[in-house]
From Swiss-Prot:
Protein name in UniProt: Zn(2)-C6 fungal-type transcription factor afumD
Major location category of this protein: nucleus
CDD domains: GAL4
PROSITE patterns assigned to the protein according to its UniProt record, in alphabetical order: ZN2_CY6_FUNGAL_1, ZN2_CY6_FUNGAL_2
Cross-referenced Pfam families: Fungal_trans_2, Zn_clus
Domain of life (superkingdom): Eukaryota
Organism: Aspergillus fumigatus (strain CBS 144.89 / FGSC A1163 / CEA10)
Ranges where the record places region Disordered: 1-48, 86-110
PANTHER family, per database record: STEROL REGULATORY ELEMENT-BINDING PROTEIN ECM22 (PTHR47657), ZN(2)-C6 FUNGAL-TYPE DOMAIN-CONTAINING PROTEIN (PTHR47657:SF14)
SUPFAM superfamilies (alphabetical): Zn2/Cys6 DNA-binding domain
Biased composition, class Basic residues, residue ranges: 33-48
Length: 373
């Protein structure tokens, strides 16, 4: 017969330290805490990594313009600190690590991209400002698509403007506005990343991307029933900012053996019509009595803006080709002073008044509206 006392003595005491079960309460709690603690993300401190990797405290491989993690997650990659001395300079081409739409995005459709490229080549290119001239039309329909194949920002800008044009031609096709917005957002984001490192290979494409973005934003403003002054001033800043981009690109390619494709656009740029400050039929937009709020510099800025509106209106009345008038309309920010834009952003009444007249005056032209849509 089994001795019950011997059996009991053979069972280890629950308080014994010879078994994992024998730990006291504090040791067990410590053990459980260690067990529950999640894996720690490996990282090293980086002063020049992108914003997102620094915020997450993970190692950034500092690939430019888009690091590995941001590319994997399909999110914008922002470098807000200059690279350390001796660091590898950032790549200027976006194609090495492209920012692509997510698989669920409606624009991530090869068939749609082919359709947009086809539409741009055959139809949208013919509506570009200045396309009444054969060399300008050929530039938009032949040279620009070719450049876009090796420069993602330009390719996405082409898709965006084609989708916008298609949405005007086929207003019942519901998905086009979203596709347009998606490609426009990608083009803007990528363009900002690339303009800091223009090369002889990308100079042409950078300039054409800048023009397409200006046309797209302007056409979008035209199609809105209500346009805020903030949107107008943003468009004006975008147009004026493009001058610095063009200057940088032209400086880089000026020693090239062959002239850049963008030169045909620059060469046909409409000259200012205004030779004086004649406001003509728009003189009612100017102050008749002095105002303590505005000094002589501000008054001159108002006169210049109104004189340009009047001069362009007279050119339209004289049957200037609608495509030329269209270009004048879109480069209005280049023909006014920076001071006028500052006054507009400060919401000075006399700066606010000319802008609606500028849009209304040309909005009445059906041909112009078609060419900028």
């Amino acid at each position: 017969m089994l001795d019950r006392s011997k059996m009991t003595s053979a069972i280890p005491d629950s308080n014994s330290s010879s078994s994992p079960r024998g730990h006291n309460q504090s040791e067990r709690d410590s053990y459980n805490r260690k067990k529950r603690k999640g894996p720690r993300l490996a990282h090293r401190k980086s002063r020049t990594g992108c914003q997102r990797c620094r915020a997450r405290r993970v190692k950034c491989d500092e690939s430019r313009p888009v690091c590995r993690d941001c590319h994997r997650h399909g999110i914008p990659c922002v470098y807000d600190r200059p690279a350390e001395e001796g660091a590898i300079p950032p790549s200027t081409g976006i194609q090495s690590r492209p920012l692509e739409p997510s698989p669920s995005d409606p624009s991530n459709d090869a068939h749609m991209e082919l359709r947009l490229l086809h539409h741009f080549t055959l139809f949208t290119s013919a509506t570009m400002p200045g396309a009444h001239l054969k060399r300008i039309k050929d530039c938009w329909s032949i040279d620009v698509p070719r450049l876009a194949f090796s420069y993602k920002p330009l390719l996405h800008a082409v898709f965006a403007i084609a989708a916008l044009h298609l949405s005007k031609v086929n207003p019942d096709e519901a998905g086009l506005p979203d596709i347009h917005c998606n490609f426009l957002e990608q083009a803007l984001r990528e363009h900002r990343l690339c303009i800091g490192g223009i090369t002889t290979q990308t100079a042409d494409a950078v300039c054409f991307t800048s023009i397409l973005l200006q046309i797209d934003v302007f056409a979008t403003l035209q199609s809105r029933h209500v346009v805020s002054y903030e949107q107008v001033s943003e468009w004006m800043r975008l147009v004026r900012g493009s001058v610095a981009v063009f200057d940088a690109a032209m400086e880089i390619v000026r020693h090239n053996t062959h002239p850049p494709n963008i030169w045909c656009i620059i060469d046909t740029f409409p000259m200012p019509l205004r030779t004086n400050s004649d406001a003509g039929s728009f003189s009612f937009l100017l102050p008749t009595v002095p105002d303590d709020e505005d000094d002589e510099t501000a008054l001159e800025a108002y006169r210049g803006a109104v004189a340009h509106i009047n001069a362009t209106w007279l050119a339209m009345e004289a049957k200037e080709h609608p495509q030329i008038s269209c270009r004048r309309l879109m480069v209005f920010p280049l023909f006014v002073t920076a001071g006028f834009i500052d006054l507009l952003e400060k919401r000075r009444p006399r700066a606010l008044v000319p802008c609606p007249h500028h849009y209304v005056t040309y909005g009445g032209s059906e041909t112009l509206h078609t060419n900028t849509s």
